[in-house]
């Protein structure tokens, strides 16, 4: 006999409230056939590769820190296209539309030859090589050595209209009921911060705050011992609902373990042995050595490698070549909101450090009788050279209610910059206006300063590049512009071999010549 029974499985119902859907910029932004080329000047920077150099007082910065292992974050400021005096006013209707920029092409050019730079520490915390050790070393009070190595090789750039989001591990606050004990390993947590210009990249020791988590100041090299190494949080940026921080990126990393060492110092986490409980873990991890052997006192188990970036070659370069943006990974398909663009770059394949030696005595070098190393001062300098070229496309944003609602939810300050003509309700029908505000009889004028629009990234360090007067419509006059015209098929070849833009839409014919008999 067939009997109906209710299903015992769980029933999943849709949410009672609708989920807000974020539209892609391709759904409401109209692209035009107007393209601009923009490029920066030759951007140069010089400094010390390991640390900042201050004067004797320690207050005035004389030589900044410039390392090949640092992030370079360029903040490119573009002109407002809504203030352009366009020759063809039929491009857009200012009463119903606004203009924005879209990135279509990018080329990050780097100067200087390829080279490997070394880093290290004169008091590096290592006992001995643990890969090919020939005697048992248990360590002493101070086992630090002067050690250097080459960092992990990394080439990377991230392009977006907001700063790149980085991640690093930081010291966390303990629980409220946990007793504070000296020498106990603190809890750590993952932190998300913007990557700023000058932040150190991971060179093989991880992405963490070495200033707070390594108090002996000798576990890593000099360039990161007092710094925080950050790594781009690709997972967070790829899952961003708007996709402004990362339109696209290119990355190439490589390393291998070159040397294997062990740390000096007292072990914080002992290897489980007979001292635990009633001895039920005895001889599970090791058997103690005899008293007449060097192995009677167990050594440290804090093993670590020093990595190497290996071969640097021009065959695997991400720079000095164009990249074309057809489809971004997020909802923002290359639209540069707020007329700005952030380019985050790391490249330590041009990591050569210059060694400069200067004779300290007041004497001509030709008159030096014999060599004395103490009379020569050695200096280190690192130089970097950049140039960035862009292909920008002019786009139109319709001033519709649903479009403005999404832009307002994304970034309400964009609507303020567009000056849409919204008249707010006056808070006070009458205001005070002084005639002689500069006289001694009235109050100080500083109490009534003009309100300036706050910078959303105030307090962050970027390499700001003003490109408001660097745009050109003559794409064929620039290297990246010619590549774009050829790549997009916007050029056609004439009879004599020259090229013209296909936007003219005119037929090109050769001159008819009379045949020779």
From Swiss-Prot:
Residues 497-517 are annotated as: Disordered. Coiled coil: none annotated. SUPFAM superfamilies: Group I dsDNA viruses. It holds the Pfam family Late_protein_L1. Keywords: Capsid protein, Disulfide bond, Host nucleus, Host-virus interaction, Late protein, T=7 icosahedral capsid protein, Viral attachment to host cell, Viral penetration into host cytoplasm, Virion, Virus endocytosis by host, Virus entry into host cell. The keyword Membrane does not apply. InterPro entries: Capsid_L1_Papillomavir, Capsid_L1_sf_Papillomavir, dsDNA_vir_gr_I_capsid. Residues 497-509 have a biased composition (Polar residues). GO terms for molecular function: structural molecule activity. GO terms for biological process: endocytosis involved in viral entry into host cell; virion attachment to host cell. It comes from the Viruses. It is found in: Virion; Host nucleus. One of its GO terms (cellular component) is host cell nucleus. HAMAP family: PPV_L1. Forms an icosahedral capsid with a T=7 symmetry and a 50 nm diameter. The capsid is composed of 72 pentamers linked to each other by disulfide bonds and associated with L2 proteins. Binds to heparan sulfate proteoglycans on cell surface of basal layer keratinocytes to provide initial virion attachment. This binding mediates a conformational change in the virus capsid that facilitates efficient infection. The virion enters the host cell via endocytosis. During virus trafficking, L1 protein dissociates from the viral DNA and the genomic DNA is released to the host nucleus. Belongs to the papillomaviridae L1 protein family. Self-assembles into homopentamers. The capsid has an icosahedral symmetry and consists of 72 capsomers, with each capsomer being a pentamer of L1. Interacts with the minor capsid protein L2; this interaction is necessary for viral genome encapsidation. Interacts with protein E2; this interaction enhances E2-dependent replication and transcription activation. This is Major capsid protein L1.
